[in-house]
Structure formats: C-alpha cells, structure tokens
C-alpha cells in the first residue's frame, strides 16, 4: 500500500490571494503534507467569489513553507494556456522548490475558457481529452531539456527549449471522474486525482481498477502512482454550523453537464442557489464527531486512495485547521 498522505485544499474560489497564502502556511503547521489549489479564471460564484492566479499563489506559499508539497488540482493546460508555457512555469517552480511541486491537470470547464476568448462551440469530451494527452506529451518532452520540434494536432513548437528544469522533470497528476481518463492516469500519470462523495461503486469498482488496468497495460507499478482524492468534509463540533457551512459550495452539487457547460459565474450561482441545503450537503462528509468523520474518511483508504486532500467549505478556515490538528489528524494517521 502506498504511503498515507494528508493534504489541504486551498479554495481559490472562496478566498483572496493573501488570505489563501496564510491558510496554506497554517495548514503545514496543522500537520498537512501537501496543499493543492484550483486554477480558475472565474469562480463558481459571482457574489463573494475569488479567483487568484494559482501559479503566483504556489510560488508565494513555496517561499513561506519548508516541506509542504504544492500542486494544482486542477489546471487545464490546453485552452487559455499554451502547454509549453505551463511546462516552463512548473519547471521554474520545480527548481525553486525541489521535490515539492506537481502539476495536476484536467480536461477543462467552459466557465474558465470561454471568458478568455475560446471561439466556437465548447468541445466535447473526446477533443478535450485528446488535447490533454497531447499537452502532457509535449510538456514531458520539454522537461527533458532538449530542443523540441513538436508537430501535434493541437500544439506545435519549433526548436523550443526550457533551460531551467529540475532533475526528473515535474510529476503530472491526472484528474479523472470516470474510468476512461482513470485508465490514462494509470498508463501515463505520476498521480491520479478524483473527488469524494459519489459512492463506493465509482471508486472501488471503476476508478481504482481502471488506474490499475492502465498501469498494467504500460507495464508500470500501480502502487507507485499517488492516488489522490479531494475529500469534501465539513467538520465542526457544532453540528448546525457543520451543515450550514456547505452552502457556499452548492455549485459542486450541480450535474457534471452543468458544471462543464455553464460559462458565466452569475448563471452558475443562480443554478446552485436553487438547490436545497440537503442536496448540497450530500456531496460532503458532514460531521461533528471526530470518530464518525474519520470512519467515513477511512472508507476511501479501504477503496484504494492514499493521498487524502481535505476541502473544508466554511469561511472560518482557521477554525477548521485548529479542529483538524486537534481532533482529526491524530486519528487519520492511524489509518495507515
């Protein structure tokens, strides 16, 4: 079994840049091994939302912490970004913070790409997935440090070189919500990312088996692939507060089609706020008892996940981190 790791999800859609940095610093002192950040150009919510630039945040946190592993969860290197430039950015961070940087990638959402000028119909999954695979190939070629002439279907480089690259390049984590991309993560990813709250069948019977299948097809050791899950947890000793804290993140309870196709945060907010709190809370582990919380988290370890990244929905993240350090972290370490 791979090493058990605990991480903190820095909610870039919810907090301003300076506050988000300070929270990551606190997360390290609370016992977290890693901190991940989403890369949104626009937030899920128009009112009260935020969208700081993820790579600037990672650099600021890197300077303020000693051992915290930092990565995106996730970034789309295929539309508003040129993957060659993302490869350069992550190579630079990898040189600044050796062994502490990874690139988490996904296929993208209209919310972030339409606003920045993507023209035409938002592509179907097939094209978005093809772009992702091609971008990963290009970035890895560039991280070898050689001059790269790349002539792909979507991306091209001519005599491109990245001059400052950490030894071994940058680990790439692939986000997957279904078995097709999970199999690709097993075949080509250094890590795999998924999110919680969708039932045992998805994780134990689809995602993890697909990762293992992909690894076997590529003659890789599946246990060497870091299997990360963003655990949506609203833990507070006050049960009413634990429930109400989930409200801000109602957009997560929209359908996958809505989340991938709505391109306006105002419309996203309207759709989310129409949901009852009971439906919103279904995506979360809502608990006021630490043993109950850890028991529910422990299911994901049994299903094959080893890197648990905790996403707390409340506005008082300092309170969550204090409670995490006091009540949850000691119990969670025993899951190993």
UniProtKB/Swiss-Prot annotation:
Keywords: Carbohydrate metabolism, Oxidoreductase
One biological process term in Gene Ontology: carbohydrate metabolic process
Pfam families the record matches: Bac_luciferase
Disulfide bonds: none
Binding site for coenzyme F420-(gamma-Glu)n: 39, 76, 107-108, 112, 177-178, 180-181
Source species, domain of life: Bacteria
Positions of substrate binding: 195, 198, 259, 283
Active site positions, chain numbering: 40 (proton donor), 109 (proton acceptor)
The protein's enzyme class: oxidoreductase
Disruption phenotype: Cells lacking this gene are more sensitive than the wild-type to oxidative stress induced by plumbagin and menadione. They display decreased ability to consume G6P and reduce plumbagin and menadione when exposed to these agents.
Molecular-function GO terms, alphabetical: coenzyme F420 binding; glucose-6-phosphate dehydrogenase (coenzyme F420) activity; oxidoreductase activity, acting on CH-OH group of donors; oxidoreductase activity, acting on paired donors, with incorporation or reduction of molecular oxygen; protein homodimerization activity
Entry note: thermal dependence: Optimum temperature is 60 degrees Celsius.
Listed EC numbers: 1.1.98.2
Reactions accelerated catalytically: oxidized coenzyme F420-(gamma-L-Glu)(n) + D-glucose 6-phosphate + H(+) = 6-phospho-D-glucono-1,5-lactone + reduced coenzyme F420-(gamma-L-Glu)(n)
pH-dependence of activity, as noted: Optimum pHs are 5.5 and 8.0.
Protein family (similarity comment): Belongs to the F420-dependent glucose-6-phosphate dehydrogenase family.
Assembly information from the UniProt record: Homodimer.
UniProt function note: Catalyzes the coenzyme F420-dependent oxidation of glucose 6-phosphate (G6P) to 6-phosphogluconolactone. Appears to have a role in resistance to oxidative stress, via its consumption of G6P that serves as a source of reducing power to combat oxidative stress in mycobacteria. Cannot use NAD, NADP, FAD or FMN instead of coenzyme F420 as an electron acceptor. Exhibits nearly no activity with D-mannose-6-phosphate or D-fructose-6-phosphate as substrate.
Note: Exhibits Si-face stereospecificity with respect to C5 of coenzyme F420.
Name of this chain's protein: F420-dependent glucose-6-phosphate dehydrogenase
Gene: fgd
